[in-house]
Amino acid sequence: MRLYRDTFRPSPAHAKPFAILGTHVICADTDEEADHLAKPVDLNIVRRAKGECLPLASLEDAAAYDYTPLDRARMAQNRTPLSVGAPATVKATLMPLIEATRADELMVTSMIFSHEARKHSYELLAKVFKGA
């Protein structure tokens, strides 16, 4: 984003640069619950690495999957770009990223199988950043 801001040229449509940061967030009431909700994402990471492009798995499918040690290593490595946790945890992971990129807006996706849990994740995240 630094390059974008450094080379930005005003236009009739945009007088100044405006950057949107896109990221993945799974937010729940507790870190443990958020980690549990992220298990289907872990399984999708494993499946995609094996060339399997399937819809987001359910919590039950993720729990029943027979993970290899390589699968587990891949899951741990790919959790890094995700913000997973309770509201305070998610804020603590996102704020340095927002500050470093000087993002004007945050665009979030939440790959959560349950519609209600996904909606709750967005509600918690909205409370975290309301007035921030």
Which stretches of residues belong to each language-model region?
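Generic C-terminus detector
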Residues: I98-A132
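An alpha-helical appendage that flanks or caps ligand/catalytic pockets
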Residues: M1-R102, K130-A132
